[in-house]
């Protein structure tokens, strides 16, 4: 029995749903220098800018829906064991119905401790009414909540898990990256 095990999805997967990409012309990096909003140093220099940047990205999720590509991947789970390995930080795979997802770059709908970002005790899933994180909002360890995003210069906590799945995959498909 063949097992379609893994799919790697990137920005192109969610662009069709209306999610802004980072690298395309007119993308997020044209409007926000990467070193300001996607590095630990940028966060240390101006946490308010970084928090607001990701608040705006979260709000964008309220206006978009999964596209047919997300839905088709979710439908594959009816007949195959599927793991979606995604570089996307949105929640469109979950909303489409995929149940086994590895987020390489973090998850926009979660926040974590500024001191210990990948400690599972301090990671919190936000409800849509909580998407507006403010300076002063604290994690369980008393530090400022920060986006649960793997920034440039940080090691992603899910990379080893993803490698294990990819190595065991009968088929590996790359979509939108």
Q: Across the structure, where does each feature detected by a protein language model lie?
A:
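Conserved catalytic core of sirtuin-type NAD+-dependent deacylases
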Residues: 1, 5-177
């Amino acid at each position: 029995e063949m097992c379609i095990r893994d799919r790697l999805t990137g920005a192109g997967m969610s662009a069709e749903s209306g999610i802004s990409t980072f690298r395309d012309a007119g993308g997020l990096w044209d409007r926000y220098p990467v070193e300001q909003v996607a590095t630990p140093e940028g966060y240390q220099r101006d946490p308010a800018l970084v928090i607001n940047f990701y608040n705006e990205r979260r709000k964008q999720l309220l206006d978009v829906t999964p596209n047919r590509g997300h839905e088709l991947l979710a439908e594959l789970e009816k007949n195959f064991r599927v793991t979606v390995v995604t570089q996307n930080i949105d929640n469109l795979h979950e909303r489409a119905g995929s149940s086994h997802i590895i987020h390489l770059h973090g998850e926009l709908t979660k926040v974590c401790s500024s001191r210990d970002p990948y400690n599972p005790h301090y990671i919190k899933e936000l409800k849509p009414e909580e998407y507006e994180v403010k300076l002063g909002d604290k994690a369980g360890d008393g530090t400022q909540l920060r986006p649960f995003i793997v920034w440039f210069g940080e090691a992603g906590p899910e990379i080893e898990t993803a490698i294990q799945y990819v190595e065991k995959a009968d088929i590996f498909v790359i979509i939108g990256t």
